[in-house]
């Protein structure tokens, strides 16, 4: 049997024949998906480091600035003892720090583990990560933090504020009202806790080579996802998985001489769909990511 339009001989196995390709333009039928790291992919797609990568409440972050923050974060992760094969619990909304941590983890050969759930389920994720450090939003309550410390190996919390990387004067009143509503319980800073800026400062004197050997098939991002099959399950993604997903969508975005933007509203929890389909994809297509 010969497939119409492509002339390919059919085997009867959809995974081999890929019959859907007959409906694609010829130029796209045999596109090869690159097996590269997320950072290599984004750099290739955004060679001009003076171009804006993110807009966040009045602050424009260029690619040069973004890579600089990644460098700081990677060094600080090494100071905290993270390295290859380690898992880093990261429970953040879609704020700039999340994307910085993703690439920083990739550089040192680690993986970030993300979850948005009840405190007990977050504790489970920390225990499975076997990590003494977790990254959380700074409105995490004292009772939740106490639970983390009592039931997991966690000894240190890095607290990220919604205002980190924002121009506070540019934040609309309705957004400030929403942010304020997140601080519902008692909040306490325990000895050893750090702000995001304090975390970045940890590695300022780090001079060793922190880069792990580049491996696109190494796990870099894990997210607990659920649906109709019961409790949330951890799904691990390698750099090449993420690149493949973003690449196959980005090829449909034509180049533009005019800076185009991709709006990600309500700062949703940074799980897999948000991170890859709603962020890495538009960034790889050369769009400016507006986090709002």
Question: Where do the PLM segments sit?
Answer:
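Conserved ATP-dependent adenylate/AMP-binding module captured primarily in the ANL superfamily
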Residues: 117-151, 243-264
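Conserved structural elements of the adenylate-forming
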Residues: 67-72, 200-206, 235-256
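Conserved AMP-binding/adenylate-forming core of the ANL superfamily
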Residues: 33, 52-81, 86-95, 99-103, ...
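AMP-dependent adenylate-forming
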Residues: 14-22, 39-62
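Conserved AMP-binding/adenylation subdomain of ANL enzymes
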Residues: 109, 243-262, 269-292
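Conserved AMP-binding A3 loop
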Residues: 62-64, 188, 220-246
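Conserved pre-ATP/AMP-binding loop-to-beta segment of ANL
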Residues: 159, 177, 181-224, 231, ...
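Short beta-strand->loop structural element characteristic of the AMP-binding/adenylate-forming
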Residues: 89-91, 98, 102, 106-137, ...
């Amino acid at each position: 049997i010969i497939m119409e339009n492509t002339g390919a001989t059919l085997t009867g196995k959809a995974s081999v024949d890929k019959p859907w390709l007959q409906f694609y333009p010829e130029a796209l039928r045999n596109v090869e998906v690159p097996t590269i790291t997320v950072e290599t992919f984004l750099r290739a797609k955004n060679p001009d480091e003076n171009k804006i990568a993110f807009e966040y409440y009045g602050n424009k972050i260029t690619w040069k600035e973004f890579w600089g923050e990644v460098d700081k974060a990677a060094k600080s992760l090494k100071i905290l003892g993270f390295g290859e094969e380690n898992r880093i619990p990261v429970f953040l909304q879609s704020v700039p720090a999340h994307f910085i941590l993703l690439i920083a983890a990739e550089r040192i050969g680690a993986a970030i583990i993300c979850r948005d759930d009840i405190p007990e389920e977050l504790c489970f994720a920390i225990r499975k990560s076997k990590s003494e450090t977790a990254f959380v939003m700074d409105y995490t309550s004292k009772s939740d933090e106490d639970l983390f410390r009592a039931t997991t190996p966690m000894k240190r919390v890095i607290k990220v504020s919604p205002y980190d990387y924002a121009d506070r004067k540019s934040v609309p009143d309705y957004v400030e009202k929403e942010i304020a509503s997140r601080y519902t319980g008692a909040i306490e800073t325990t000895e050893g806790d750090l702000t995001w800026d304090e975390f970045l400062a940890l590695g300022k004197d780090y001079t060793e080579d922190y880069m792990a050997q580049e491996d696109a098939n190494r796990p870099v991002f894990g997210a607990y996802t659920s649906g109709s099959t019961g409790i949330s399950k951890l799904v691990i993604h390698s750099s090449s998985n993420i690149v493949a997903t973003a690449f196959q969508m980005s090829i449909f975005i034509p180049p533009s001489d005019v800076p185009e933007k991709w709006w990600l509203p309500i700062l949703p929890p940074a799980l897999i769909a948000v991170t890859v389909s709603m962020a890495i994809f538009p960034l790889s297509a050369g769009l400016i990511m507006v986090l709002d």
